[in-house]
Design a protein with these regions (language model features):
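Accessory helical-bundle/CTD segments and flexible terminal tails appended to RecA-like ATPase motors
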Residues: 1-137
Length: 137
């Protein structure tokens, strides 16, 4: 049963569906624990990252890592990427953008950003929404 719930959650594609899913969970199991709420926010974070051209997102030890899509040059010239760069470079003590290197130290072409002092999934979601809308922090 748990696996089918996770699969259904993974298949959702918009906020309305997510809210309907949450309502069904509450109807079935009662009030959701904080961990379940955070899981719903993980889905929201994944959607937001897709919209921003972020292929992978990790939050570990209060550090948010955003791995950008390997894509054509259009993305690197986009308004969204420009907002990310502006945010990162205006906070050099907290953020940086770098390029991955292979075992021999050669660039792989994969770029990523790290942002320190992000404590929760909710915090990451709020921060990325602010970057996306150009409202900073």
């Amino acid at each position: 049963e748990r696996i089918s719930l996770y699969r259904e959650l993974d298949s959702l594609s918009n906020e309305d569906d997510l809210l309907a899913y949450k309502k069904r969970l509450i109807d079935r199991f009662g009030a959701l624990p904080e961990e379940a709420e955070q899981l719903l926010n993980v889905v929201r974070l994944r959607w937001l990252c897709c919209k921003m051209g972020i292929e992978k997102v990790m939050l570990k030890q209060e550090r948010l890592t955003l791995v950008f899509t390997r894509t054509n040059d259009k993305y690197w010239q986009s308004e969204v990427f420009g907002r990310i760069v502006e945010f990162v470079y205006s906070r050099p003590q907290r953020c940086r953008i770098a390029e991955d290197k292979d075992k021999q130290g050669k660039p792989t072409g994969r770029r990523y950003a790290t942002i320190q002092q992000v404590k929760t999934i909710s915090g990451a979601l709020t921060l990325l929404n602010k970057i996306l809308t150009g409202k900073g922090e």
